[in-house]
Amino acid sequence: QLNMALMLFLAPSSDELDHVLGEQPYYDIDDVRLTFSPKDFIQVNRDVNVKMVEQAINWLDIQPQDRVLDLFCGLGNFSLPLARRAKAVVGVEGVDEMVARATANAAANGLDNATFYQANLDEDVTKLVWAQEQFDKILLDPARAGAAGVMQHIVNLAPSKVVYVSCNPATLARDSQMLLQQGYKLARLGMMDMFPHTGHLESMTLFVKTNHHKKNSNVM
């Protein structure tokens, strides 16, 4: 449910936001409460977002032993529902404030198996602590610019399944080529009307690793 109580925030400057009245706004998704600030990025269409999270969980077929990597994780929209089912979830996000919010949301929901890191995913991440870990499945939900900077690392990690959520068909098509060329097949494709009465759609794709493809020589 979306908290609909009266809330009042004042912005004395572009860098400040004072919480004057009411609770912190929140979404309830899959028995997880996600609190956020009016300045945070969050999916505006709660009902479609809930369905999108449910579909991602189903497509990834999360098992109790799975370790899951959530790239461009924001405040934990996918990470925390995934952590309800997986052994461990690592979320990576470029904005410090969102990493702090995701960490606080994990603690508030009693999810000690979700860990969050700040990183610029347009740069080489291979030497970062979280990038040295192994993951069974990966979800990514980048901005319109896509995820070109991290696609090679996703391939190197060799997860069994990848769910890519996109708001830009052009960058989704570009980034998908890396997966298709490295032994993944497109197993599912869905469209979600996140923004009714506009020309914008949210896409979700599931890629599944096949066994007959020889690994790329860059794989570590």
From Swiss-Prot:
S-adenosyl-L-methionine keyword on record: yes
UniProt keyword terms in alphabetical order: Methyltransferase, rRNA processing, S-adenosyl-L-methionine, Transferase
Entry EC no(s): 2.1.1.190
Active site (record annotation): C167 (nucleophile)
UniProt catalytic activity: uridine(1939) in 23S rRNA + S-adenosyl-L-methionine = 5-methyluridine(1939) in 23S rRNA + S-adenosyl-L-homocysteine + H(+)
One Gene Ontology biological process: rRNA base methylation
GO molecular function, one term: rRNA (uridine-C5-)-methyltransferase activity
Top enzyme class: transferase
Annotated residues for binding of S-adenosyl-L-methionine: Q43, F72, N77, E93, N120, D141
Job description of the protein: Catalyzes the formation of 5-methyl-uridine at position 1939 (m5U1939) in 23S rRNA.
Annotated family: Belongs to the class I-like SAM-binding methyltransferase superfamily. RNA M5U methyltransferase family. RlmD subfamily.
Name the UniProt record assigns to this protein: 23S rRNA (uracil(1939)-C(5))-methyltransferase RlmD
Gene encoding the protein: rlmD
